[in-house]
Swiss-Prot record:
Source organism of this protein record: Edwardsiella ictaluri (strain 93-146)
Gene name as annotated: hscA
PANTHER family for the chain: HEAT SHOCK PROTEIN 70KDA
Keyword Chaperone attributed: yes
GO BP, sorted A to Z: iron-sulfur cluster assembly
Protein name per Swiss-Prot or TrEMBL: Chaperone protein HscA
CDD domains xrefs: ASKHA_NBD_HSP70_HscA (cd10236)
Length: 616
């Protein structure tokens, strides 16, 4: 999808100037930054060659440090070393303390209730800590790319609410970054594998990180990823594998005393190294101090099998919440370093009945997907198959009587946006209305692009114009259009979602704009003619009903004169002269004014019949 710099056809500026963009995976345990270079998405390493940046910040009186160095000092300076700050994003202090009662920090609430952490550098909040991590990633990207970033895409969990998403945006702005978009982490992983241009269907994203497990069920339809359901376990991750193995190793070494924190740390480090080794070999040797032992993959599998089973139970629940079966899942994407464990891959494959996608480094797949999206959104791929827009390139509207288009959202409107208009029924007793959604700049339906049709049923059977239908067009930040039609008195409604940009190239957009300019005068004339034809039909329909009901109120000559004007209007409406139709409507209006007055008097007399003046 190319983010277009919308301009008038033929006036696009600097078409070959490449912009610098990055994708950022702002993780709970580790963060990464990636970019697209020479057509390939890749994560960027620091000067030591490390791609993962630990999401840890240590605050000191003279400043702060971010990453591995900060993490190494966490044990010695826990009050000033902040980690897993993502868990606090968008939450109140009370919520944080209820969820995580054993945090080592000294915290108090700000005026807005946000947690404030007391450090040697002063009080900091989750937004500021996240901004420091983002700034470190930004500096890495700018050093690698040789210039300032034009924009970034930052990933967030699919379950993040508005407050958490806004907090992430605020952190990015504080770090001096221009946020092109927040992208759901499972969607980013799917994009990294190119699933956004694949066949339509259900995709599962299994994300097992160091401290958390998330399962997301997505549906891909016409280029749109819809999150059907999310689930998981916020207290289950690869760290739990490490602790189980470390405890087992201590038992093998005959060391059950846990009072020596340094020794416990060495066993934990040894467990991590063993777990990594067993991902590629059947057994490995473990050395801690004077003790040496062996551990096999089978032994590790036996230890962690109950935890892996817990993740699969969460998958089962989330599939049920999504209303889909395992057989409906087309692809399973593996995310998170802990999915390298062979037992995890095997069990997940058996559960879903298909081989999971694992060819992209699971630690990096989310950042890579974000980088691909950022490269598109910043405008470096104008010929991409998909199209995401920060403005609407072509007007969106709906069909009205006479084959006309009523524009609801004009082109070049910034998104996200929502607009609404009210419409009424055309005929007496009308109980349904067809909503035809269109895209384009022309005046007539036939000259525009049809996006979708749906029907609003259950409209009360009132006289023409009596029912009021409010039609709302809403386009979100990803260009997804939702159209909702609601009858105001009953609240009955119908809706549809569509991707206006799906399957539409920049050349086609430009072509449609040029057509609208070239045909502007003719289109306006055609619209005026169609509008007069619709008005003529409305007048004739109304007159037909009135004559059927109250023609006895007219004398023979009066009725003949009205019939003559009625026939003349019908003849004019069958022709193509706008002025002739307009004139015929005026003649018929003049002929029926007295008839309308008599009908009003008759209606009042019928309403008052049988009632006294006092009752009135």
């Amino acid at each position: 999808m190319a983010l277009l710099q919308i301009s008038e056809p033929g006036l696009s500026a600097a078409p070959h100037q490449r912009r610098l963009a990055a994708g950022i995976d702002l993780g709970t345990t580790n963060s990464l930054v990636a970019t697209v270079r020479s057509g390939q998405a890749e994560t960027l390493a620091d000067e030591q060659g490390h791609h993962l940046l630990p999401s840890v910040v240590r605050y000191q009186a003279g400043g702060h440090i971010v990453g591995a160095e900060a993490r190494e000092q966490a044990a010695d300076d826990p009050l000033n070393t902040v980690s897993s700050i993502k868990r606090m994003m968008g939450r109140s202090l009370a919520d944080v303390q209820a969820r995580y009662p054993h945090l080592p920090y000294q915290m108090h609430a700000s005026e807005s209730g946000m947690p404030q952490l007391a450090t040697a550098a002063g009080s900091v909040n989750p937004i500021q800590v996240s901004a420091d991590i983002l700034a470190a990633l930004s500096a890495r990207a700018q050093a690698a790319l040789g210039g300032e970033l034009d924009g970034v895409v930052i990933t967030v969990p699919a379950y993040f609410d508005d407050a958490q998403r806004q907090g992430t945006k605020d952190a990015a702005r504080l770090a001096g970054l221009h946020v092109l978009r927040l992208l759901n982490e499972p969607t980013a992983a799917a994009i990294a594998y190119g699933l956004d241009s694949a066949q339509e269907g259900v995709i599962a994203v299994y994300d097992l990180g160091g401290g958390t497990f998330d399962i997301s069920i997505l549906r891909l339809s016409r280029g749109v990823f819809e999150v059907l359901a999310t689930g998981g376990d916020s207290a289950l991750g690869g760290d739990d594998f490490d602790h189980l193995l470390a405890d087992w190793l201590r038992e093998q070494a005959g060391l059950r005393d846990r009072s020596d924190a340094g020794l416990a740390r060495r066993f934990l480090d040894a467990a991590v190294a063993a777990k990594i080794a067993l991902s590629t070999q059947q057994e490995t040797t473990v050395c801690v101090g004077d003790w040496q032992g062996e551990v096999s993959r089978d032994q590790l599998d036996a230890l962690i099998a109950p935890l892996v089973k817990r993740t699969l139970l969460a998958c089962h629940r989330t599939l049920k919440d999504a209303g889909v079966t395992r057989d409906e899942v087309l692809e399973v994407v593996m995310v998170g370093g802990s999915t390298r464990v062979p037992l995890v891959r095997t069990q997940v494959g058996d559960f879903f009945g298909r081989q999971p996608l694992t060819t992209i480094d699971p630690d990096r797949v989310v950042a890579i997907g974000a980088a691909i999206q950022a490269d598109i959104l910043v405008g470096n791929k104008p010929d991409a198959d998909m199209l995401l827009l920060d403005v609407i390139p072509l007007s969106l509207g709906l069909e009205t009587m006479g084959g006309l288009v009523e524009k609801v959202i004009p082109r070049n409107t910034t998104i996200p946006v929502a607009r609404a208009q009210e419409f009424t029924t055309f005929k007496d007793g009308q109980t349904a209305m067809m909503i035809h959604v269109l895209q384009g700049e022309r005046e007539l339906v036939q000259d525009n692009r049809s996006l979708a049709r749906f029907t609003l049923r259950g409209i009360p059977p009132l006289s023409a114009g009596g029912a009021h239908i409010r039609v709302t067009f809403q386009v979100d930040a990803d260009g997804l259009l939702s159209v909702t039609a609601m009858e105001k008195s009953t609240g009955v409604q119908a809706a549809i979602q569509v991707k206006p940009s799906y399957g539409l190239s920049e050349d086609e957009i430009v072509g449609m704009l040029k057509d609208s300019m070239a045909n502007a005068e003719g289109d306006l004339s055609a619209r005026m003619l169609a509008e007069q034809k619709v008005e003529a039909a409305r007048v004739l329909e109304s007159l037909h009903g009135a004559l059927q009901q109250d023609s006895a109120l007219l004398g023979e000559q009066e009725l003949a004169a009205i019939r003559q004007a009625q026939t003349a209007l019908q003849a004019a409406a069958d022709g193509d002269e706008t002025s002739a139709i307009e004139a015929a409507i005026k003649v018929l209006d003049a002929q029926t004014q007295e008839f309308a007055a008599r009908r009003m008097d008759s209606s009042i007399r019928r309403a008052l019949a049988g009632h006294s003046v006092d009752e009135v």
